[in-house]
Amino acid sequence: MTHRVDQEYDYLFKIVLIGDSGVGKSNILSRFTRNEFCLESKSTIGVEFATRTTQVEGKTIKAQIWDTAGQERYRAITSAYYRGAVGALLVYDITKRQTFDNVLRWLRELRDHADSNIVIMMAGNKSDLNHLRSVAEEDGQSLAEKEGLSFLETSALEATNVEKAFQTILGEIYHIISKKALAAQEAAAANSAIPGQGTTINVDDTSGGAKRACCSS
């Protein structure tokens, strides 16, 4: 979802949070949008979203962050919300190996439903629980590189790298949008320079000295 608006913000970007239930997606959302953390947060039911407006290279970007439930029974519901997303944060819990093992399944589902140009970052969350770690940071980095994703370890509790993760995603999206806009402008300029394109005004002399304007394209 990329809308151009001239009042409150320049662009609206839809970003989805995906990953297994319990990896901390809701707290990542609340940390980024409200700078809050809830120790007793419950599992998301269905889909929730929140927004935050931020600056990217002088442009005002409104980030619309969708928190998609990780439970199996909501998968059919959440798949519909991939449509229109231009960014995704794929989250696993560094203390639970199974959530990391499921990353490829989430990635496959995302790529099946989302736009092929979607910007994806993988985040190993709960880095504050390093003493309980079951997924090495190198494993996360290696998988991300293999799949062509950005990667960070985050802590919603300590607010570590949460801001950086979203700013990186938003920055990459903005660069893609800017390149597309520039390419479109260059294509339009090239087309206008080609003879025979557009509207031509022909002025013909008539026998009475009057002039007639004929439009042809």
UniProtKB/Swiss-Prot annotation:
Top-level taxon: Eukaryota
InterPro entries named among the record's database cross-references: P-loop_NTPase (IPR027417), Rab_GTPases_membrane_traffic (IPR050209), Small_GTP-bd (IPR005225), Small_GTPase (IPR001806)
GO MF terms, alphabetically ordered: GTP binding; GTPase activity
Annotated motif Effector region, positions: 41-49
One of the record's GO cellular component terms: Golgi apparatus
Region of interest called Disordered, as start-end residue ranges on this chain: 195-217
Gene Ontology biological-process annotations: protein transport
Homology family: Belongs to the small GTPase superfamily. Rab family.
PANTHER family in the cross-refs: DRAB11-RELATED
Protein name: Ras-related protein RABA2c
